Amino acid sequence: MKDKMQNQNFMHTLNSEQKKAALHTEGPLLLLAGAGTGKTKVLTSRIANIIQQNLALPHNILAVTFTNKAAKEMSERVHNLINCYGVNIGTFHSMAAKILRDQIENLNLGLNNKFTIISHDDQLTLVKDIVKLKKDIDTKKYTPKLIHIIISRWKDQGLLPSKLSASDTNLPLQRVAKLIYEEYQKNLLISNVLDFGDLLLYNNELFIKNPEILKYYQEKYRYILIDEYQDTNIAQYLWARMLASLYRNICCVGDDDQSIYGWRGAEVGNILRFEKDFAGATIIKLEQNYRSTLPILAAASNVINNNKNRHSKTLWTDSASGEKIKIISCLSDKEEARYIACEIDKLVREERYHAGNIAILVRAGFQTRSFEEAFINSAMPYKIIGGLRFYERMEIRDVLAYIRISLNQNDNLALERIINVPKRAIGAASLNKIRSYALERNISNFVAIKEILETGIFKAKSYESLKDLLTKIDNWYEKFITDTPINVVKTILDDSGYLSMLQEEKTEEAFGRIENINEMLRAIAEFNDIHDFIEHSSLVMENEVLETNYGGSVTIMTLHAAKGLEFDVVFLPGWEEGVFPSQRSLDEDGEKGLEEERRIAYVGITRAKKDLYITHAESRKIFYEIVHSCPSRFINEIPDEITIRTSSMKKYNSFYKF
């Protein structure tokens, strides 16, 4: 009786369409959830309802998100609703990694379940190393970075080297990338490591080649829920389809109008063809917005309605009031920045808004410089989101490499990162000898060093350093078996000389690096198993998002980074043809590119809760050139009756004296 009342209580908080989605329990469901319509609330209510109706046990439900933060929030909400843990909630990568840990040997690739997941930077390093060995490749024309991007896109599409078709390798660059891709995969397998693309790629291979394993997971995950479906790539889409093909109890939640990650592999077609993929699917639209005012929603709807390839939906709100959209014309980008800085200063001084609830969302990174100057001049606290994230910092990656090589001695990338840090008299020549020896014999660098040490070809100093390092790595491996992760990592820091190296440097930078390592140790202390920490750090590096603790500073960030966030006041600068929509997107992708740009505009508009400013400049300095431009076509798509259009100089004359 208590459970039933609790069920009724949380259902009572849902609107009619939300309730319809939460009560839907059989067959495929596409939940089209517009910005600010409470999709997480619906997802968690649906999970709670399935459990309370005894349709599935918690561990038979799989909920997939794109970030660790979203997964954690979803898990906490389910627990708060029905006091239940045990639902499988995680990111695509974490769920795929979990399956591979249990099943990797069934792929017969020589991998074992102790594999490690390498970071984006380590992936690029490996590509660079392979390209260096290919003397006939023009690295100026075919850069390692570009080759790596192509390899990553192929993985997003679920394509191993053997599955690339003639159309995939039409261009000379693609043919070069295919050669590197083949070597890249071989190197990963030898090192017993995977990159992020491999997690879904090999999951799909596992399911295709082993129908009985697929059947096991289909039985295990009888109810599947996928958040942000519009952001899925082809590999993720295939994975979800295979898992759901038996019971067809799949609920995909998304908004095609917010699909803005095409440049990194997201395929908006996945959500647009849901009804074809799952015949007889139920479609429910969430259109009641709980975030923004009526004028903001009207602006967003009028802009996005110009896209042809979309599911029709219109956001609405019970709130009839709200400030009109301010559209401001400025003479230059400098004046635009000065106007925005002055307007924010006015809003804060008059105590209408707190600085931490104000954001400037730009289309491209080059736009931020003028705002930095304007805020420095006005003494307005601000932060630009986009610096190095914690797990990407040099010292953190060094310590992670030490841990990885201690756990997996075949991890070539980890070994090469730390082999001469601190200095051990092991230069490029010695490293090349090791690499060549290993490649010729199809063995890892660690094994190669052991064999080479027997030959005596290294100089005495290098010989002693390498012998000492290998002995320590063996000792650390043994210590991880018997001691706690935190104690072993402290030992590694001391034994390796890494901590001493930083302490002896005695600079502010070195002090900051030591502080970061101490913070890392605090994170490690929360884990009983070092493998769990390594996996956690790898997945965080891939999925880390901005924490919503803005303090007292104005936030400056890109529109892409702002997705999923909200602010009381939003400024959208640079709404000019060529800047937004981006000329590059128009040139490269035509109408498809324009529609993605319009979706980015829609995302920007719907970040605002109460007040929205859109600015454009008649001239802008772009890469040392003054460019004259016209207002963005997106501005013309916003109805006049919900806007106040003026120039920055008029505003200056009204509010400020210069």
UniProtKB/Swiss-Prot annotation:
Keyword terms: ATP-binding, DNA damage, DNA repair, DNA replication, DNA-binding, Helicase, Hydrolase, Isomerase, Nucleotide-binding
One GO term of the biological process aspect: DNA replication
GO molecular function: 3'-5' DNA helicase activity; ATP binding; ATP hydrolysis activity; DNA binding
Stored CDD domains: DEXQc_UvrD, SF1_C_UvrD
Enzyme nomenclature, EC number: 5.6.2.4
Binding site residues for ATP: G36, T37, G38, K39, T40, K41, R291
Residue intervals of the UvrD-like helicase ATP-binding domain: 12-293
Disulfide bonds: none
Residue ranges constituting the UvrD-like helicase C-terminal domain according to the UniProt record: 294-564
Pfam families: UvrD-helicase, UvrD_C
Chemical reaction(s) catalysed: Couples ATP hydrolysis with the unwinding of duplex DNA by translocating in the 3'-5' direction; ATP + H2O = ADP + phosphate + H(+)
InterPro entries: ATP-dep_DNA_helicase_PcrA, DExx_box_DNA_helicase_dom_sf, DNA_helicase_UvrD-like_C, DNA_helicase_UvrD/REP, P-loop_NTPase, UvrD-like_ATP-bd
UniProt similarity note: Belongs to the helicase family. UvrD subfamily.
PANTHER family registered for this protein in UniProt: ATP-DEPENDENT DNA HELICASE SRS2, UVRD / RECB / PCRA DNA HELICASE FAMILY MEMBER
Protein role: Has both ATPase and helicase activities. Unwinds DNA duplexes with 3' to 5' polarity with respect to the bound strand and initiates unwinding most effectively when a single-stranded region is present. Involved in the post-incision events of nucleotide excision repair and methyl-directed mismatch repair.
Protein name: DNA helicase II
Organism: Rickettsia typhi (strain ATCC VR-144 / Wilmington)
Gene name of the encoded protein: uvrD
